[in-house]
Amino acid sequence: KMMYPIGNALKSILDKILTDPRWDLKFIGMQLIIEGLALAAFQSTRELAKDPVLYDMLGLIIRDEARHVTFGVNYLEEFVSTLSEEEKNDRAQFAYEACLLSRERLLSTDVFEYFGWDVEEARQFQLGSDLIQHFQKLLFQRVMPNLARIGLLTLSLIHN
């Protein structure tokens, strides 16, 4: 029996979010990054769904997930505007690191290791796949505009 526990990258993102004592980082991490991952995953699955019931069900799930993201954006937009530049940069760096981990989460390195494959070769192959590139595009089309809207796509982050 094969089981795939939570991957290292997703575990790392969740640990980073849940262990930080600042409530707003939990909001940024969960409402924007993790929910953004969920939206992208459901959207890519919906685009491939051939069963009309699954297609419709995924549409409802996407709508619900989008409400979660919107709630986070609306709540954080006002709060972030009250932060100092240093605090904004700190939160922007947190979001940036979570996005990098999100990208790594797409790669099944645990599975590659399990099957004894060359991890870097399999990783590069997977990064080049149309499906992964499409998923990344969906993910970052959802996450980046929201980070910009709440004021966390800072110049220091862009020049990073």
Q: What are the residue ranges of the model-derived segments?
A:
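Inter-helical turn/loop segments and adjacent helix faces that build the functional surface
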Residues: F42-L60, N74-N89, D118-R123
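Carboxylate/His-rich catalytic cores and anion/metal-binding grooves
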Residues: K1
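Extended, helix-rich structural scaffolds rather than catalytic motifs
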Residues: E85-I158
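Acidic/His metal-coordination segments adjacent to aromatic residues that form catalytic metal sites
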Residues: G7-L32, L48-A49, E97-F112
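Alpha-helical transition-metal enzyme core signature, strongest for iron centers
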Residues: I28-F42, I61-G72, L76
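Alpha-helix initiation and N-capping motif
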Residues: G7-K11, V69, E85-K88
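Alpha-helical scaffold segments that form or flank carboxylate-/histidine-based iron centers
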Residues: W23-F27, P52-A66, R91-Q93
